[in-house]
Every structure is written in structure tokens, then in C-alpha cells.
Amino acid sequence: VDGDYRCFFRLGNVYRQGIGPVLEALGERYRLLLLSGDNDREREKLSAFFAVDDMRFGQSPTDKLEFVGTLPTSGHNALMVGDGLNDAGALQASAVGIAVSENTSVFSPACDGILQAEHLQRLPRFLRFATGANRIVVASMVLSLLYNAVGLSFAVQGALSPLVSAILMPLSSISVMAFATGATRLAARYTGVER
């Protein structure tokens, strides 16, 4: 009133609870890129987690889609994490798309996974678990190949009767499944995904 201010409002972005430690943990293992539809007012605050050249502000949904689409041509696999409809195209174009949702019963864009917002801090653990699960799949295949190679060598030599071969064949499958199940449970406990 008459040049005398009685109050003022300061507007700013509010980030999800626990996002700082999540970005720090992910930044230790992966290159992090930020694609935001917002203006660059938060650039300084976000520079603690993202390199200056890895932050892109004012991005439209099409800009995000095009940027994520170019990553495979430069030899990068993108895991896109988004929380809005404006991220839908980029989520679908990425190698792995994870939608962060407050409520899983509402519409979520086409993606590979939906993560409840309250569990966002577990994302680094889920990614470590996924890496371990890939190793378990490879180890299971190697175990199966070794088991069958040994069994085949005995069978070719005539050292196994048809009855023993018939018994060993399902045991091969059972042992590989038991290994995969046990190793997956151990990996889940080790990474903190399962308690």
C-alpha cells in the first residue's frame, strides 16, 4: 500500500523427500542427466547432483523424447525416471522406464515399472538387485550348460542307462531352478530389497 509492502510470497520447487541421498547413491554408479520442463531457477541447487552440462531445463515432452531417443545412438542405455504425463514418451523410448506415482490406481504412462513415490529412496537398491539378478541368470545358464555337457559326455560313452538319464534330466532343471531361487533370495537380502 503506497509503496509499503505488507507481505510477500516466495515460490520454489519442493522435491520429493529423500531425493538427495537417492541422487548421491545413483551418481556414484551412473551418469545422471536432468530433463525438466521447469525453468532453470533451481540450477544452482541441483548442481550438487548433476553436472552443469547434464541439466536441461524448459524441456517439452517432445524435447525429452528426442533426447532420450538419441542416447542409444551414442552407445548409452537410458533408465528414465519420471512422474508426469509429460514424461510418457521419454519413459517409453528409454531402455527402462520407471514411473514414480503417488497412487498406483491412477493413470500411469506406458513404462516398464511403477515405483510408489514413498519408496523412491529404494531405487538404488532395486538397481543393484537388478544387476545381481542379471548375473544370476547368466550363472544359471552356465550351470545348466555344464550339467548338460557332463551328462551328454557320459551318455555318448554309454556310461548312463536310459533310466538314469531319465532321472537326471528333471534333476538338472530342478537344481538350476533351486540355484536361481536361492541366489535371487540371497541377492534380495544382500541389497536390502527383501528384509
Residue ranges of model-derived segments:
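Conserved ATP-binding TGD loop and adjacent catalytic N/P-domain core of P-type ATPases
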Residues: 1-139
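Membrane-embedded transport module
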Residues: 111-195
